[in-house]
């Protein structure tokens, strides 16, 4: 089986205001297994969100190739890019809900824009999704009337309408308290288990999310380290990994872990 996503010798750099070049990804190669959950971690400015934007075609690589489900999508544009994006569901830091639309209208949006379903079919599917994500009775509310956790649920429900093969989450629990964050991670785990999609999560909240992950990648200084267990990371002798554990993870064994 092909990996869901594969980077082959990908380099991406930016020119800063002072003229210096900052290399975010430096000849990086890695793969994301299909049907599994991969967490991308790293400090601020290390390229986590850039990696997601490259996957979605929102940025171009400077060199190298990106494969999605076995297809080379490097530099794809036009209808090819539109087709690529139908394979993804996305939930960014903010839920990206339209404030002027109700919960129902927000969730129905991809069905109205990208399918030929009639209104009766759309209504049936949306109401079923709202029930699945414990949003019954909220369909006529507006985003501003919902808590941060409820907004995340709406965003996830909308992202799932086209049944994507791959879900991308960019800091999905930003702004939520620890209890709500844990609840949202449990929701991700249940949804992934039910639908079987590939899940890519950019997060700094490693202690709570670790048991959700089949694989963890750590970005640092343009390079990427791949780990598959808490023990593997904690016992790494690489100085930058030790620093990551100290400043970001703490003692993950004493944290409230999400069970897969």
Language-model segments: residues:
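H-loop/switch region of ABC-family ATPase nucleotide-binding domains
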Residues: 203-204
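A short, surface-exposed alpha-helical micro-motif characterized by mixed small hydrophobic
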Residues: 209-211
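A short, proline-enriched helix->beta-strand linker immediately N-terminal to the Walker B motif
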Residues: 161-165
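Conserved ABC ATPase signature
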Residues: 142-146, 150
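Catalytic Walker B motif of ABC-type/P-loop ATPase nucleotide-binding domains
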Residues: 167-170
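Conserved ABC ATPase "signature" region
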Residues: 72, 119-137
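Helix-to-loop junction immediately C-terminal to a conserved catalytic motif
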Residues: 56
């Amino acid at each position: 089986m092909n990996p869901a996503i594969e980077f082959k010798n990908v380099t991406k750099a930016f020119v800063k205001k002072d003229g210096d070049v900052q290399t975010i990804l430096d000849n990086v190669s890695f793969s994301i297994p299909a049907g599994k959950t991969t967490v991308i971690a790293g400090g601020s400015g290390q390229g986590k969100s850039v990696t997601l934007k490259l996957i979605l075609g929102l940025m171009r690589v400077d060199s190298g190739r990106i494969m999605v489900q076995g297809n080379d999508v490097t530099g794809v544009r036009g209808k090819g890019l539109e087709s690529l994006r139908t394979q993804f569901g996305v939930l960014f830091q903010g839920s990206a809900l339209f404030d002027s639309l109700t919960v129902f209208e927000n969730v129905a949006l991809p069905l109205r824009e990208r399918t030929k379903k009639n209104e009766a079919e759309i209504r049936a599917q949306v109401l079923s999704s709202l029930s699945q994500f414990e949003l019954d009775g909220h369909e006529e509310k507006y985003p501003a009337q919902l808590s941060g956790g409820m907004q995340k649920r709406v965003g996830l429900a909308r992202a799932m309408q086209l049944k994507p093969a791959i879900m991308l989450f960019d800091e999905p629990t930003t702004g939520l308290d620890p209890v709500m964050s844990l609840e949202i991670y449990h929701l991700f785990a249940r949804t992934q288990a039910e639908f079987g999609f590939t899940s890519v999560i950019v997060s700094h909240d490693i202690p709570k999310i670790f048991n959700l992950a089949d694989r963890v990648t750590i970005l640092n200084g343009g390079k990427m380290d791949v780990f598959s267990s808490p023990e593997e990371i904690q016992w790494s002798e690489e100085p930058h990994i030790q620093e990551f554990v100290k400043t970001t993870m703490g003692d993950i064994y004493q944290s409230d872990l999400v069970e897969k």
